[in-house]
């Protein structure tokens, strides 16, 4: 997926979950930018961190910029747009290029089942698969961890997937998408959200398909790369 032209900035501070103050490196001007990722991001959003941003499409928006990438001190890139994960998976499903779901046809995105909405509904030889996608940005070395903040909604969805998987008409899966260029494995971060980690383990034990995929990330492009191990 091609990224728009990005402007180099430096992180100043974070007034709230969805807004960051940045300093342009070309004009030294301080600007406000929308932050698409509401996670804690404590390891990334440190004073002086390099942020790559794009101008807002809507000239009337309160924040004139959107934060797209963060560059770590080691030179790794991390996507700050959680929506990229679903966009990449949708493209890969449509083109049959996602190894873990080979042969499955994309039927619907944001499918409602009961009182909940799930990311994707897939079909294969009369079978139906419900798929949830999770974006992973927290990394320590080459290990990715999820979540980086408590996600009650995420745990609820995983338990609903587990219940669906026990029904004869459904199969279910969770796909963790690394949005950090250096991640080669994914683990559950139980010290941040023990309930989500418990829900994933229960899901895995009851047959929910748990998988993860890495990404190739640059300031020009982002694309899914290889299937990587998940530790549950």
From Swiss-Prot:
It comes from the Bacteria. Transmembrane segments: none annotated. InterPro entries: SfsA, SfsA_C, SfsA_N. One of its GO terms (molecular function) is DNA binding. Signal peptide: none annotated. It holds the Pfam family SfsA. Belongs to the SfsA family. PANTHER family: SUGAR FERMENTATION STIMULATION PROTEIN A. NCBIfam families: sfsA (TIGR00230). This is Sugar fermentation stimulation protein homolog. It comes from Shouchella clausii (strain KSM-K16). The gene is sfsA.
């Amino acid at each position: 997926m091609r990224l728009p032209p990005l402007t180099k900035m430096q992180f100043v501070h974070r007034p709230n979950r969805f807004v960051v103050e940045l300093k342009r490196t070309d004009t030294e001007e301080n600007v406000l930018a929308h932050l698409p990722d509401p996670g804690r991001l404590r390891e990334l959003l440190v004073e002086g961190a390099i942020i790559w941003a794009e101008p807002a499409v809507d000239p009337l928006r309160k924040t004139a910029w959107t934060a797209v990438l963060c560059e770590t001190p080691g030179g790794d890139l991390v996507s700050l747009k959680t929506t990229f994960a679903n966009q990449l998976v949708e493209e890969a499903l449509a083109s049959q290029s996602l190894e873990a779901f080979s042969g499955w046809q994309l039927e619907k995105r944001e499918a409602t089942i009961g009182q909940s909405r799930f990311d994707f509904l897939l079909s294969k030889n009369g079978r139906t698969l419900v798929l949830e996608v999770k974006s992973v940005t927290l990394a320590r070395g080459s290990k990715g961890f999820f979540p980086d903040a408590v996600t009650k909604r995420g745990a609820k969805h995983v338990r609903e997937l587990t219940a669906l998987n026990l029904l004869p008409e459904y199969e279910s899966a969770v796909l963790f998408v690394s949005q950090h260029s250096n991640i080669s494995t994914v683990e559950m971060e139980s010290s941040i959200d023990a309930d989500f980690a418990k829900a994933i383990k229960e899901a895995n034990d009851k047959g929910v398909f748990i998988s993860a995929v890495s990404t190739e990330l640059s300031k020009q492009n982002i694309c899914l790369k290889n299937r990587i191990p998940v530790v549950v």
